[in-house]
């Protein structure tokens, strides 16, 4: 069981790092070249994308953290 949890933690850490890089690469900073309705639509689309990616990052981070807590519990009960 401990080996499976450690493998899961490692895999989640890899996925988290990839998602954090994707967040930086996919979601550009606010742009000033749009005006009016186009600017509003662009900003809304970016906000939606950022929220979606941030939710994914948070979910994977929470899973990794819960896995770390499970590892600690297994280790404490084994000793």
Regions found by a protein language model. Name each.
Residues 1-79:
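N-terminal secretion-targeting helices of virulence/extracellular proteins
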């Amino acid at each position: 069981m401990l080996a499976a949890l450690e493998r899961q933690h490692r895999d989640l850490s890899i996925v988290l790092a990839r998602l954090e890089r994707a967040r930086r690469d996919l979601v550009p900073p606010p742009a000033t070249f749009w005006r009016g309705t186009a600017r509003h639509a662009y900003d809304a689309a970016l906000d939606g994308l950022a929220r979606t990616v941030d939710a994914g990052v948070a979910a994977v981070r929470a899973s990794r953290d819960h896995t770390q807590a499970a590892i600690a519990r297994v280790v404490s009960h084994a000793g």
